[in-house]
Amino acid sequence: MNKFSVIFKLSFINTIFFYLPVLANNSPVDYVNTLVGTQSKFELSTGNTYPAIAMPWGMNFWTPQTGDMGDGWTYTYNADKIKGFKQTHQPSPWMNDYGQFALMPVTGGVVFEQNQRASWFSHKAEIAKPYYYKVYLADHDVTTEMTVTERASLFRFTFPEEQNSYVIVDAFDKGSYIKIIPEENKIIGYSTRNSGGVPENFKNYFIIVFDKPFQFTAVALDNAIKTNQTEIEGNHAGGIIGFSTHKGEQIHARVASSFISFE
């Protein structure tokens, strides 16, 4: 055995021993990059995927949303703004989605419209795994994290020191409903948005429970904000809740949904 062969083998063994602790602490799922295949658009398909956060055979998936409401290409890698964090059931952009709705944290002024609430983000400040997603929203100085179960999800929003911190709930257009219940730190609603293939009475009912009392409430109908109401139904309904937050304060939201009822 020559000297170079011995050196090579020793180097290989040292490399293996160096990485063994890293490999031992990781599950196979940690090696999945859910951003692969997201550099797609209508004109050119290069994967047609989105970074789904989901359990195997889960009823719902969740994803950051860079596309417009109803756009089958809900997340594209080359986009630079996030407009919401959406519950989705989309198998393919060509088939589109059904029952979708979204949450979005913002700071500063009260807004609802998807482009007004959108925030710049960077892939350098983004973690995308099948079971967990995290991103920093630069315009609002808010970090959003989410994880899921088979039928529910958990959000954690880390806010800056801000008198005007908000979470927007967008039930999307083509028929939706929102009711804010301040005494229970709760928002309920439904989305009927779909691309066909559902029953005539289709609704995706959802309940969102927060762990901090609301200091501000408003609803929106077709992007018009109404501060004197806590319930709205129409083509495009939404809700806005507000808080005063200190630097680094974390607000959690638990989200559950059903195709049957609020119960």
Language model features by range: what are they?
Residues M1-K9:
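Positively charged n-region of N-terminal signal peptides that target proteins for export
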Residues K9-P21:
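Bacterial N-terminal signal peptides
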Residues N25-E263:
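Accessory carbohydrate-recognition regions in carbohydrate-active enzymes
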